[in-house]
């Protein structure tokens, strides 16, 4: 029991969230990302957006919601370091080839502009960190809520 408690005590800092970095990331999001990406959409809203798109209607959003972006990127890059590395690279040099969006997202929104080129390394790190830690829902869970069943 004592070994378990010591192990847990040593592991806590590894899993702790840096709230200052999280706040800085949110500030970067508000300043540089929120013009196109809304912060969060419910599964019902996302489903509504998809139905509108299928009918050829103009969407009330300019890019996928950030909670959907986070869940989708985590599907391919589940670890924090790999997620942050991907996001920092993608926002600096976005392309359809390295993107992980659903094909419909590229059709509706195209490839995002390279906003990362206007950000410092610290800002890119912060916004990627915020995107990773701010949203907990997995892609599978998001799809299950939208469709009422498990999807892969």
Curated annotation (Swiss-Prot):
It comes from Aquifex aeolicus (strain VF5). Residues 20-135 form the Cytochrome c domain. Residues 1-16 form the signal peptide. Keywords: Electron transport, Heme, Iron, Metal-binding, Signal, Transport. Heme c binds at residues 33, 36-37. This is Uncharacterized protein aq_1854. GO terms for molecular function: electron transfer activity; heme binding; metal ion binding. Gene3D superfamilies: Cytochrome c-like domain. Pfam families: Cytochrome_CBB3. PROSITE patterns: CYTC.
